[in-house]
Amino acid sequence: MKGLVITTDDLMRTEEYTTPLHESIGKTVGGWIKVVHPKLLPAPYCMIVNEEGLLLGLPVNLLGSILYESFRHGNPIVGNIVFCKEGFVEGERDIIGLDDDDLKCLGALISAVSGGAVKWAVSYTHLRAHETLMN
């Protein structure tokens, strides 16, 4: 299952997750996960955050806080966040992965909302492979 990660350093990357999701996504967000539904994020997308991020003193995630409208209620989103979709698995509501169209849609939304501040992380493995092909 693919998710879209936004770090507190304003870097964006795709990441592959396995079940149990609370463990694999938990590693990315740094602890217990909480699914939130920001008003500025269209359905069926959701944002997964660290449930105890404020208690742990994690840094503010500006993009997450903007989407969550933290300026209205004063509760910021902190730490790395993972975007996924909600859907149904075997008839039960669950978190499901993103496909390529979802990644393009969310990438465009994130770029627009952040004014271009959030950028795709550079894959050094990809760069090395490209250099090898050029030689």
Describe these PLM feature segments:
Residues T125-T132:
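Conserved small/polar residues in nucleotide/adenosyl-binding loops
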Residues L41-L63:
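Short, structured protein-protein interaction patches enriched in aromatics and acidic/basic residues
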Residues G74-C84:
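Ubiquitin system architectures
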Residues K2-Y17, L21-S24, N61:
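Feature detects long, helix-prone N-terminal segments enriched in hydrophobes
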